[in-house]
Amino acid sequence: MLRFWQEKLPLLPQELREVLEKTITHNLWRKYETINLIASENAMSPLALAAYVSDMMHRYAEGKPFKRYYQGTRYVDEIEHRVMQLMGELLGGAHVDPRPVSGTTANASAFRALTNCGDKAVVAPVQAGAHVSHTKFGTLGGLCIEHIEMPYDPENMNIDVDKAIRLIEEVRPRLVVLGGSVYLFPHPVKEIADTAHSVGAKLVYDAAHVLGLIVGRRWRNPLDHGADVMTASTHKTFPGPQGGIVATRSEELYKTISRVVFPVFVSNHHLHRLPALAVTAVEMKYFGEQYADQVVRNAKALAEALAAEGFKVLGEHLGYTKSHQVLVDVRAQGGGAKAATLLEKANIIVNKNLLPYDPPDAIKDPSGLRLGVQEMTRYGMKEDNMKDIARFMRRVLIDGEDPEKVAREVKEYRKEYLEVKYCFDVNPLEDGRLYLLL
């Protein structure tokens, strides 16, 4: 396939060559040469990728399956209906709307459906991992919902349950939000849900980062513990196409939120996501528990290995992590911005991140790194590989080795881990071309 591009590219206009060359270079670099530890990313299987690249990316299907405002959607309707069934089964009998095109769109739909402008929302604090869409600067604020943070318990690296309960009873909000984008341990859903319901509030749990762990039964299903609504992304620990879902076990809430998804926040919902999401849902049905178990074991192994190599890893007294994430304080190595930049030069991709004790204005150069092991787990890495990754990181950030030298070793190391695991052994991708569905 590379030879094909080498022969054809010179025949194209310069501006087009530049775009295609950068796309090819990106694909080769990120997919085949780097160790990706971004906690919000993953890799679809070849079969899901083949299903993703379909004619559906050109089509519209506003509305609900079998009740569209467009013709020509008979097969889209059947696939979307199957997605709703599959995801509902994986989540223990939930009503699922797969039309949000992102986790934030899912959040916006749930927040808008359950509140009015001027209502109060009590949310998990930034220290406990709240996503930007939960804040006054993000979606909540944009919907003119008053944002009130729960107290944080630094010892347990979680919400302070007793103080949060008292706050909810005092404030009597319309909405309570748990979950987020940076958290190592499950939020206390049942305790908070009971209090929320006692004051007439609804609880929304943002499971964007942990959907794959929930489906794989390695993270509590918030719907089992009192959450009224769960929102999620379909492309983090759940290794599907980029997109979002809203799930609830209340048919009434499902109908209310669905009427907000369309037409308030979504018109067409990027239909080519649906076949790929269906493929991934079936993969998770058959392989999800193995995958989620290995993700959690790898995260713990990486945390322990990094600590052994001399890094300050958060949460040691709590066992480091129960999720796919690891948090590392790299102030001694120059701070999060410097560390992330050096690691990228070494072909190790991470993101700088605020740690619980960082002030909000440190966002451009925070104390920490947020690491996620889900994608490398998907490529077959296990506990011993986490030790190797920790050694690579130590050589760059503690020993001060030339990152370009380490990058060459990382590139060679990745050659053994290029095949997606925890999926069906069907590869419709041959030499870069799709032979199954096109």
Curated annotation (Swiss-Prot):
Positions carrying N6-(pyridoxal phosphate)lysine are: 236
User: Where mainly located?
Assistant: cytoplasm
Q: Which cofactor does it need?
A: pyridoxal 5'-phosphate
Q: Write down the InterPro entries for this protein, in alphabetical order.
A: PyrdxlP-dep_Trfase (IPR015424), PyrdxlP-dep_Trfase_major (IPR015421), PyrdxlP-dep_Trfase_small (IPR015422), Ser_HO-MeTrfase (IPR001085), Ser_HO-MeTrfase-like (IPR049943), Ser_HO-MeTrfase_PLP_BS (IPR019798), SHMT-like_dom (IPR039429)
Q: Which Pfam family name is an example for this entry?
A: SHMT
An annotated GO cellular component of this protein is: cytoplasm
Q: Which UniProt keywords apply?
A: Amino-acid biosynthesis, Cytoplasm, One-carbon metabolism, Pyridoxal phosphate, Transferase
Gene Ontology biological-process annotations: glycine biosynthetic process from serine; tetrahydrofolate interconversion
- The protein here is known as Serine hydroxymethyltransferase
